[in-house]
Amino acid sequence: MRIETENLILIPGTTNLLTSAIQGNDFLSKALGYVVCPDWTEFGVAPLAYTLEMLTQSEDKNGWWTYFPIHTVDQKLIGSCGYKGRPTPDGMVEIGYEVCPEYRQKGLGTEIANGLLTHAFNDELVKLVIAHTLPMENPSTKILRKLSFKKVCEIVDPEDGVIWRWELKKP
């Protein structure tokens, strides 16, 4: 299911789109039907391959992984975003997002995060949305604060080291 915001359409990553993204920007552009920012992701193909593996195991997880944010005026893929899987049994889901450099500082990161948040809270199972950031003030921490997330703790992630955990409970 697409998520639509004022300036964006967030297109869920299907197995076809994820396979195309892994093959390269030209393949992704053709599969999406939109121009692709050359530096739309800073994370490489590993997260896309992981998502593809999860969707291959069970298509019912679709809508709870990667989304491709399209800028509606420019008709261009400007980053990536999504969830780290379906809500847990106790109703928690994690969001993540990135915006390519040429589209930063325009409110689009906030718009992406808010779209993910609204979509998550529209699901009756979701009670809590979390996010993680580097342990310093940065654009992502500003976005989360703007959306009423609270920094709840500092944790040590096996891959990223020390990170901050943010939470927002369903209103």
Feature annotation, model-predicted:
Residues 131-141:
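Conserved beta-strand-loop-alpha-helix junction that forms the acyl-donor binding cleft
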